[in-house]
Regions:
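Residues at the C-termini of beta-strands that transition into short coil/loop
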Residues: 9, 115, 136-138
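A signal for specific C-terminal beta-sheet/loop modules enriched in small/flexible residues
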Residues: 21-24, 130-135
Length: 143
């Protein structure tokens, strides 16, 4: 079977848009034309997106509305700080108590968010170990 990758070149906020990005009001580039092209293709479709918060936004950049199987993202740094019994505290682009800081979400499409190896605004991680994700695709699961 065919596996198709869509790597999105999403705009990053520059310094003047930094506050808007932190507040979750930054306007990302419209990705609909890229998803329209992806819709024309068959097989298992993987979307590579830096920003997990675009998976289920209420705006036009709600990636989960499109026809694909898996989105791989990072950016959230696992919530930077994780408090026991509470969870992730802060994530760039999502603010306090982010929904998509780490882990797996949804069925189809499915989102996998890696905590990654780096840091965000704070050069410290608390109860939040760096990680590299390994994803196994099984042919009989998507034929």
């Amino acid at each position: 079977s065919l596996i198709t990758f869509l790597g999105l070149d999403e705009d990053q906020a520059d310094f003047k848009d930094y506050k808007a990005r932190k507040n979750g009001t930054f306007q990302y580039k419209d990705m609909k034309p890229y998803f329209d092209e992806l819709d024309k293709l068959g097989g298992f479709k993987i979307v590579l997106s830096h920003f997990p918060e675009n998976f289920e936004k209420v705006e036009e950049n709600n990636y989960s509305q499109y026809d694909f199987d898996l989105q791989l993202s990072g950016h959230a740094h696992g919530g930077q700080f994780i408090l026991p019994f509470i969870g992730p505290v802060y994530s760039p682009g999502q603010g306090l108590f982010p929904k998509y800081a780490k882990g797996s979400f949804g069925e189809r499409p499915q989102l996998i968010v890696s905590r990654g190896l780096g840091n965000a605004e704070f050069p410290l991680r608390l109860f939040n170990h760096p990680e590299i994700n390994v994803v196994y695709l099984e042919k009989d699961k998507f034929d």
